[in-house]
A protein has these predicted regions:
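Extracytoplasmic small-molecule ligand-binding "clamshell" domains
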Residues: 1-44
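Bilobed "Venus flytrap"/periplasmic-binding protein-like clamshell domains
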Residues: 1-7, 64-122, 127, 204-209
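Stable alpha-helical elements in mature extracytoplasmic
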Residues: 20, 24, 36, 97, ...
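Hydrophobic residues within well-ordered alpha-helices
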Residues: 28-29, 81, 129-131
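A ligand-binding cleft/hinge motif common to bilobed small-molecule-binding domains
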Residues: 37-49, 128-162
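A glycine-rich, hydrophobic loop/mini-helix early in the fold
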Residues: 37-77
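Solvent-exposed coil/turn segments that connect beta secondary-structure elements
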Residues: 40-42, 70-73, 86, 91, ...
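Periplasmic-binding protein-like
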Residues: 59-69, 148-192, 196-211
Length: 211
């Protein structure tokens, strides 16, 4: 990292990409990481804000969760959904891809006993499976790029507000210089990200305006 403040405070910068919820939980629960892009509920579940001082420095926007189909708008009705093939995320901590749809299905009296649930490793894989005809309905967010291959007319809202991804920094002291330097780093990452969702970043207050 070329930021002089970060170079001064850290001997080296190492990037770790978690491959599963297990990785994420382990890194947060044991205080392994200094900077993390995760959901707020994971930090709260392990008390990492109190134990390790994980502090939110920036956040991407909240979003909505949907049941998305290829040729018709799904109906939130047990009789309609019975026999359908569902695509969900194989990440129990994912709200739009796992928690929200599982909650809705449970409320409707649906489970793996009366519907076919297939699990996939990413939202990209969910879309591939839907387009390939492997499943009838997926649960996910709606991205701008989805307009190219899917129709929002065939997206049924499940939950209007799902907490977005957030950046947390380990701060066991009030290190304002580091707080502001890390904000600039994540802003640079956001500005250069290819996906529109990640280009939108809300910075926590406490620093001079970032240019």
């Amino acid at each position: 990292c070329s930021n002089k403040i970060i170079k001064r405070q850290y001997g080296e910068v190492r990037i770790v990409i978690g491959q599963s919820d297990y990785d994420t939980f382990r890194y947060i629960n044991h205080g392994v990481v200094d900077l993390a892009l995760i959901k707020k509920n994971v930090v709260e579940a392990f008390g990492a804000d109190e134990i390790y001082g994980l502090t939110r420095i920036a956040a991407h926007p909240n979003y909505s969760a949907y049941f998305i189909s290829l040729r018709e708008k799904p109906v939130l009705d047990k009789e309609y959904l019975l026999g359908k093939r569902f695509g969900l995320l194989d990440y129990p901590s994912s709200r739009s891809g796992h928690i929200v749809p599982k909650t809705v299905m449970q409320e409707l009296g649906l489970s793996a006993n009366n519907v076919d649930i297939n699990y996939y490793s990413s939202h990209k894989e969910l879309r591939r499976a839907l387009l390939a005809g492997e499943v009838d309905i997926i649960s996910s967010y709606w991205a701008v790029e989805d307009n190219e291959s899917l129709s929002k007319n065939y997206a049924m809202p499940l939950q209007e507000t799902v907490s977005g991804m957030q950046w947390f920094l380990k701060m066991q002291t009030k290190n304002t210089d580091l707080f502001c330097a890390m904000q600039q780093v994540v802003k640079d990452i956001s500005d250069s990200h290819p996906r529109p969702y990640y280009k939108t970043l809300i910075l926590e207050e406490g620093c001079a305006t970032h240019e």
